[in-house]
A protein has these predicted regions:
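Pyridoxal 5′-phosphate
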Residues: 15, 19-442
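Basic polycationic patches enriched in arginine
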Residues: 2-4
Length: 442
């Protein structure tokens, strides 16, 4: 792993990496920000998105961790599907530009690059919490003394509800069956070591470790590789909600031996409100027909799907967890956005993201008159692009003032303003504008 060092020298802030012999200075100036934008090889991707308007101008949008912007190509692709439906009717399942029978196949290779998987290990389907329930029916199979689930305290509420009700469905008391790992006294973040130690301490009572890959509130990225290794060492499965990780941080789910994961697509993947979710199932499970999964005709092997026979025969891979055919209109935006990711490359996006978020962090550290602290990890490798500002007071007033000045951020109770400089469409000048407006709020 590359080591990064942060130094403050005078009015400049330096981001240093082992791969560079010269530090890169950050400066709180418009000239600096615009200069960085001129050198940004990904800058043109900004022009491929539609921005909401405020007083006749584009807003400064830092809310991609809640809902990503609309790619301009969505309208064209949606109209294309509508035309194909009008032109072909039912024959569109095989004659449409993207034949609907095999529509989900067009997504797998591109998603696999983003999450570090084999293409048969991923599929776009359903929505996040639906997928979490579906996957837990396969991977949470409590028996005897092995029935406990380890998760982080303060997980996104939908994850909490899913885990709680799955535990109840199996006849267990959530207060006994769910082990929540909390931050140490006085801290905001959960240490990876504390999760790993809790797994080892609980030992063979653990059936499943279920963590949010990036915590929605703090923006902390957990060490999924070592958490997975710890889970496997006690005979438990490891699964992850990657809602805030997918499209944000490159991952290696296959190489990390993750058992399963699920995500939404409407945040960093820019696939529209309520957009289709996705799942990862490691090939050792996806190719095991004896592993229980709920059946549906789209999970059945394709060659016998329309023979209408009794007996569910799962196809190989994550696609066998599908139940129904792809919701084409709901997946159009996903198709458009994944094309942009394929062109930009997740690793190149991450390189820009590290510097862009580092610049925003530096600018926030220059604000001395407002009572907030950044609770997101300072180490770049432990976060994505989100920074969470925890306000001691006046937080909602500051958030409202940002909104009134054409800046779209995100408010999360209690008392946090979340901002996410997304490398596909945010710029260094955006970061400077945020700093400029925030500096003037009293």
């Amino acid at each position: 792993m590359r080591k990064r060092i942060f130094l403050t020298l005078g009015h400049q802030y330096y981001f240093c990496a082992k791969i560079s012999s010269m530090p890169i200075p950050y400066e709180a100036s418009l000239d600096y920000a615009q200069g960085e934008d001129r050198m940004d090889t990904l800058y043109s991707f900004r022009e491929r998105f539609l921005f909401p308007q405020h007083n006749g101008a584009d807003v400064t949008y830092f809310c991609g961790n809640s809902l990503g912007l609309q790619p301009k190509s969505v309208e064209y692709l949606m109209n294309k599907e509508l035309r194909d439906w009008a032109r072909y009717g039912v024959e569109g399942h095989f004659q449409a530009t993207y034949p609907w029978f095999s529509y989900h196949h067009f997504f797998s290779e591109r998603l696999a690059k983003i999450v570090g998987a084999e293409k048969d290990e991923v599929v776009a389907m359903n929505t996040l919490t639906v997928n979490l329930h579906v996957l837990m029916l396969s991977f949470y199979r409590p028996k005897g003394n092995r029935y406990k689930i380890i998760m982080e305290a303060g997980a996104f509420p939908s994850d909490q509800y899913a885990v709680e009700t799955q535990v109840r469905m199996h006849g267990y008391d959530p207060n006994d069956a769910i082990i929540e790992i909390t931050p140490q006294a006085g801290a905001h973040l959960i240490e990876d070591a504390d999760i790993i130690n809790a797994i080892k301490e609980a030992g063979d009572s653990v059936a499943l470790v279920m963590i949010g890959g990036v915590n929605y509130y703090t923006g902390q990225f957990f060490d999924l590789e070592n958490i997975t290794r710890a889970a496997h060492s006690v005979g438990a499965y490891a699964g992850y909600d990657l809602a805030h990780a997918v499209g944000n941080i490159p991952m290696e789910l296959h190489n990390w031996n993750v058992d399963f994961a699920c995500w939404c697509s409407y945040k960093y993947l820019n696939s529209g409100p309520g957009g289709v979710g996705g799942i990862f199932v490691h090939e050792r499970h996806g190719n095991d027909p004896t592993l229980f999964r709920l059946g549906g005709w789209w999970g059945n092997e394709e060659k016998t799907r329309f023979k209408m026979q009794k007996g569910f025969v799962p196809q190989k891979g994550a696609a066998s967890w599908q139940m129904s055919n792809a919701p084409v209109f709901n997946m159009v935006a996903h198709n458009a956005s994944l094309d942009l990711f394929d062109k930009a490359g997740i690793k190149e996006l991450r390189k820009k993201s590290l510097k862009l978020t580092g610049y925003m962090e530096y600018l926030l550290q220059q604000i001395k008159h407002l009572p907030f602290e950044i609770i997101t990890p300072a180490e770049p490798g432990r976060r994505g692009c989100q920074l969470s500002m925890l306000f001691k007071e006046k937080g909602r007033e500051v958030f409202d003032a940002l909104t009134q000045n054409g800046i779209v951020a995100d408010w999360r109770e209690p008392n946090v303003v979340r901002i996410a400089p997304v490398p596909l469409y945010n710029t260094f000048e955006d970061c400077y504008r945020f700093y400029e407006v925030l500096s003037q709020i009293k």
